[in-house]
């Protein structure tokens, strides 16, 4: 597994990403996910220590293009790393609007440093 920040590792451990969940790299395009998906990535924001920190993100709208700048944008809510989460709570974050409005963010796709990753729930096994 790739090396993630301590905050990301703790988040993944809380939501059971090794058991019921899986982490996959997704393209930096409108097929990166749908509303309610949890993504995480490193984002270039200035220079110096901490300028490329990991962000955990609840997607509300896949990539859109800004008419003025031509930038591809990713919109949604920043998920606080220090919260307490379970696989079930991740599913309800989007539906129940549990994130504070001041956490709403728009990220420029070209400033995402490295791969864009999505946390996906594994489909249940079919028992015959």
Question: Can you describe what each PLM-predicted range is?
Answer:
Residues 2-35:
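Mixed-charge, Lys/Arg-rich low-complexity intrinsically disordered regions
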Residues 65-78:
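Short, solvent-exposed secondary-structure boundary/capping segments
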Residues 78-128:
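Intrinsically disordered, low-complexity, charged/polar segments
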Residues 29-48:
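Short coil-to-beta transition motif at edge beta-strands of beta-rich domains
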Residues 50-65:
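Short beta-strand-centered aromatic/proline hotspots
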Residues 35-38, 53-56, 71-72:
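Short, surface-exposed beta-edge/turn micro-motifs
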């Amino acid at each position: 597994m790739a090396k993630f920040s301590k905050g990301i590792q703790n988040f993944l451990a809380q939501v059971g990403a090794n058991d019921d969940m899986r982490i996959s790299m997704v393209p930096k395009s409108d097929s990166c996910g749908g509303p309610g998906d949890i993504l995480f990535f490193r984002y270039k924001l200035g220079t110096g220590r901490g300028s490329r920190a990991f962000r955990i993100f609840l997607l509300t709208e896949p990539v859109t293009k800004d008419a003025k700048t031509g930038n591809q944008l990713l919109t949604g809510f920043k998920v606080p790393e220090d919260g307490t989460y379970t696989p079930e709570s991740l599913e309800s974050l989007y539906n129940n609007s549990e994130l504070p409005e001041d956490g709403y963010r728009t990220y420029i796709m070209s400033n995402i440093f490295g791969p864009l990753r999505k946390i996906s729930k594994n489909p249940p096994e079919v028992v015959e």
